[in-house]
Structures are given as structure tokens and as C-alpha cells.
């Protein structure tokens, strides 16, 4: 998704946020 795409650009915090959102 958009969050994952941003995370790939170096957003470690967004990775955690995306994981929480998915949970």
C-alpha cells in the first residue's frame, strides 16, 4: 500500500505503523 511504499524509502516508523494497521 502507500505506507509500505513510503517505508521502502526509509520510513522504519511507517513500517511499524503499517504492521499495526494490518493487525
Swiss-Prot record:
The N-terminus is blocked. The C-terminus may be subjected to proteolysis. One of its GO terms (molecular function) is GTP binding. It comes from the Bacteria. Keywords: Cytoplasm, Elongation factor, GTP-binding, Nucleotide-binding, Protein biosynthesis. Its main location: cytoplasm. One of its GO terms (cellular component) is cytoplasm. It is found in: Cytoplasm. Different sizes are detectable in 2D-gels depending on concentration of the herbicide dichlorprop [(R)-2-(2,4-dichlorophenoxy)propionate]. Monomer. This protein promotes the GTP-dependent binding of aminoacyl-tRNA to the A-site of ribosomes during protein biosynthesis. Belongs to the GTP-binding elongation factor family. EF-Tu/EF-1A subfamily. This is Elongation factor Tu. It comes from Delftia acidovorans.
Amino acid at each position: 500500500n502507500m505506507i509500505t511504499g513510503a517505508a521502502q524509502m526509509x520510513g522504519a516508523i511507517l513500517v511499524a505503523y503499517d504492521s499495526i494497521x494490518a493487525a
